Design a protein with these regions (language model features):
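Acceptor/aglycone-binding surface of glycosyltransferases and processive sugar-polymer synthases
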Residues: 2-83, 112-121
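Alpha-helical elements of Rossmann-like donor-binding domains used by nucleotide-donor carbohydrate transfer enzymes
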Residues: 7, 47, 90, 126-129
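Residue-level signature of catalytic and energy-coupling elements of molecular machines
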Residues: 20, 69, 95, 105, ...
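Short, surface-exposed, polar/charged, turn-prone segments marking secondary-structure boundaries
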Residues: 46-50, 94-95, 130-135
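Catalytic donor-sugar/metal-binding loop of nucleotide-sugar-dependent glycosyltransferases
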Residues: 56-57, 79-83, 92-110
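C-terminal catalytic/acceptor-binding lobe
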Residues: 98-137
Length: 137
């Protein structure tokens, strides 16, 4: 829901965050119509991130709802290699690596039953991305 955009911007401007992200795993979030497979896949991916990066500083790597400060835009975006589904994860991991402050806000999330995400190929690309980032951490 785009009305939450103001909450993201407020996290940056009023709470001194460098990046604010929506999190479906925030305790105050509401998630609707999520299939068991999508929930499992999402939780497994986030668990894998925590295994590879024990200190990530965020719970939900791919909500896809974020706002960044001018500082991140200027100093970090050019370091991100991925321009597909792994972009969000890479943005968060590099933000943590370089000491930027990450804030998560709750969201109201309704799953799209008509999603065109190819789970297997996306998962393979994401795992490769995680390994690439880990090797350069």
């Amino acid at each position: 829901d785009l009305k939450f955009t103001k909450l993201l911007i407020d996290e940056i401007t009023k709470n001194n965050s460098d990046i604010a992200v929506g999190s479906r795993l925030h305790r105050k979030s509401k998630v609707y119509d999520r299939t068991l497979m999508r929930e499992f896949t999402s939780r497994a991916y986030n668990l894998l991130i925590h295994v590879i990066f024990p200190f990530p500083g965020f719970k939900d790597a791919q909500c896809g709802f974020e706002a960044i400060s001018k500082n991140i835009r200027k100093n970090l975006l050019h370091k991100i290699k991925d321009n597909e589904w792994f972009f969000d994860t890479e943005l968060l991991l590099l933000s943590k690596k370089y000491g930027y402050r990450i804030s998560e806000i709750p969201v109201i999330w309704k799953d799209d039953p008509d999603t065109r995400v190819k789970v297997i190929s996306t998962a393979i690309k994401d795992i490769k991305g995680l390994l690439r980032v880990r090797l350069n951490f």
